[in-house]
Amino acid sequence: MSRIVMVHGAGNDLWGPSSIKSRWFPALADGLAWHGVAIDEHDVTVAFYGDLFRKDPEDGYEPAVDRAGAIATVEELVQRLDPHVDLAELTKMLTENHFDRLLAQAAAYLQQPSLRSAARSRVADAIGPDTRVVVAHSLGTLVSYEALCAHPEWSVTDYITIGCPLAGDIIRDRLDPAPSDGVSPWPGSVLRWTNIVDPNDPAGRTTPCGRFGGQVTEYKVDNGHRVHDPEPYLNNRWTGQAVAAGLAAG
C-alpha cells in the first residue's frame, strides 16, 4: 500500500481517481522538491469517493440537498457573525466560485448516513500498513477525520489538511465523534497534524488549532485567485515540509 493517501474534496463527482492523481501528484511532488524529497507514483494513492455524488437523470435522481438551500444556510451563519454583511455580494461570490455546489455535497455527506459510511469506507480501503501520511482537502477533511477517529489502530502518523472546513461550528458539531465540552477528539493514531490555509479561502477561515484535543501546527499561504484549489495548496513549501516530515519519520 502507498505511503501517502490523498483524500479529495467536494465537486469531484465528474472526475475519477486517475484524473485527480494526474493533477495532484505533480503538485505534491513540487511541494516536496522544496525540501529535496522525491516520490514516485507508487507512493501515492487517491482515496476516491466522488462517484457517490454522481447521479444521472437516467437514475431518476433528485438532488438530496438544494444548492440554493446550502447558500441560504451559509448566509444565515455569516449574518450571525456580521449583521452588516452584504448578502447579495456573498451569494454572488459563492455561486461564481461554485461553493454552492461544494456546500451542497458537504451537507449531503453530513445528512445521509449511507453516503457518509460509503465515503469513509473508501478512505479505509486506501489506507494500509505502510501508510504514514494522509493529505486531505475540503470535504475530504471531514471524511478522513472521521475515518481516522474510527481506526486508531492505523499506522498513520501525519495528517495534513488543506482548505479545511472542519473547525467551523456548523461542521464540527455534526462530526462523528462529536465534540465534548467544546473540544473534538484527536484523530486516531496521528502524531502530527498540520493545517495549511489561505486566509482568503472561505472554507478554512476557522482554525482547528485548540479545538481538537491536541496541537495543530498551522501555516498561512497565498493561493492567489485560486484560494480553495488543491494544487496551489499542495505545491506550497509548507505542505511539502509536513509531508516530508511524515515520510522521514516513517
Give each language-model segment a name.
Residues 1-67, 71, 84-135, 139-250:
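Lipid deacylating catalytic domains
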